[in-house]
Amino acid sequence: MIPFALKALFANKLKTILIYLSLIFSIISIFLISSISNGIISMYSSMLKSDGDIIITQSNISDTFFSNVNINLIQKINKIPDVIESSALIVGASPVEKLPIVAIYGASQNRFKNYKLELGNYPKQNEVIVGKSIYEQLTNKNEIQIANKSFKISGVFKSEIGFENGGVVLPITYAAEIFNKSASMIMVNTNLNSNLESVIKEIKKLDTQIDAKT
């Protein structure tokens, strides 16, 4: 049976090549997505130091990359005593030009200030900002496509979180449409010397499907 299978493969060389290419691309994609996931873990530790006292994700999931949290919780979270501000982020991945997998971040408007612009302006309707390392690799430095949607490049940023410099940031509403999720995570800033455990307890009362960590 094996000789017949080998004969069939050699008889159709184009089909065989396509199968090999498909396998290679799948393996590369797995490694790249794994790399992005590891980058997200690194990003978490940086966020907890400089970008939020509490991070909220979906509970009982195998990988934070697949987290989906209701962004509308922000309105309720902001009413909890000692909470100063909450922001949301969607994390995804997509091919961009010749790059097979690029990290895509959908950010709520109040998160844009976390990205230090080196060129241009923060994104508005149908616009994105790109990390410095990605920008240098783009052939078209005016526009990019994400999931068959075209976006104008409004600016270039440099983030203190090194992994983000290799990504693309766009308004969270567009990312929600592309990745079919509300928010990957919500970051909560609290007053100095606030009781974080008490705040977390109140946050968890809002939704049984979320997890909150300091």
Predicted regions located by residue number:
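Extracytoplasmic
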Residues: 51, 99-102, 125-127, 139, ...
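The feature marks short, hydrophobic/small-residue-biased sequence motifs that occur predominantly
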Residues: 72-80, 87-124, 145-147, 153-156, ...
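Mechanotransmission and gating elements of multispan inner-membrane complexes involved in transport
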Residues: 145, 156-214
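Hydrophobic, regular-secondary-structure patches
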Residues: 28-102, 201-205, 210-211
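Short, solvent-exposed hinge/capping segments at secondary-structure junctions
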Residues: 109-115, 130-142
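N-terminal Sec/SRP start-transfer signal
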Residues: 1-29, 41
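Juxtamembrane loop-helix boundary motifs flanking transmembrane segments in multi-pass membrane proteins
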Residues: 1, 5, 65-69, 214
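Short aromatic/hydrophobic contact patches that present stacked aromatics
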Residues: 55, 127-129, 185-187
